[in-house]
A protein has these predicted regions:
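Iron-sulfur cluster-binding electron-transfer modules in prokaryotic oxidoreductases
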Residues: 1-180
């Protein structure tokens, strides 16, 4: 329901949230099984609105909490950038993001001057100047990073557009540099 809620359509948002809640309770055996959501902003909204029995995880938490000790990480001599989304920071997951990236890369850059990408849900599609303004300090603070990672596809689009490097899901980093 987040897409509807952010546009002011509260009734539709509540209806979609209820539909999602019912579907996830069924799929997770009433919360017994964990659920992975690939977008950190969506997950934050889900945690705020859905049944508390649901064990909801975003990619960083899921990999860190469930897979980190089961995988063998190969640390490569690369510098990667990570971006902690606003929702990642609100959920307190930013340290896990940096640590997870550090298991795969010799150097991790997380520009302190960039606290929000400025994409603002879907507004970056319509107002790219919001994104450009939010990321004004990104490019000069990448310090040799050749690839970037985050946990929100829309943020990653804007980060890629404004950085000169490609940003993608942290899942790609973990999959690329691990084995069982």
């Amino acid at each position: 329901g987040m897409a509807f809620s952010s546009k002011g359509f509260r009734k539709q948002a509540a209806q979609k949230a209820e539909e999602l809640n019912e579907a996830l309770l069924r799929a997770s055996d009433n919360g017994r099984l964990p659920i992975l959501c690939d977008m950190s902003p969506c997950l934050l909204h889900m945690r705020e609105t859905l049944d508390k029995r649901l064990r909801l995880y975003e990619p960083v938490e899921f990999i860190y909490d469930f897979m980190r000790d089961r995988l063998n990480f190969t640390k490569l001599p690369v510098t990667v950038a990570v971006h902690s989304t606003c929702s990642t920071t609100k959920m307190g997951v930013q340290d896990k993001l940096v640590e997870l990236a550090g298991l795969c890369a010799n150097r991790v850059v997380s520009p302190a001057q960039v606290t929000c990408c400025g994409w603002a849900g879907d507004r970056g599609f319509f107002y790219p100047e919001l994104n450009a303004s939010g990321l004004h300090y990104l490019k000069p603070n990448l310090h040799g990073a050749t690839e970037g990672y985050s946990n929100s596809r829309t943020c990653e689009i804007g980060l890629t557009m404004n950085s000169g490097i490609s940003y993608k899901s942290i899942v790609y980093l973990a999959v690329s540099y691990t084995h069982l």
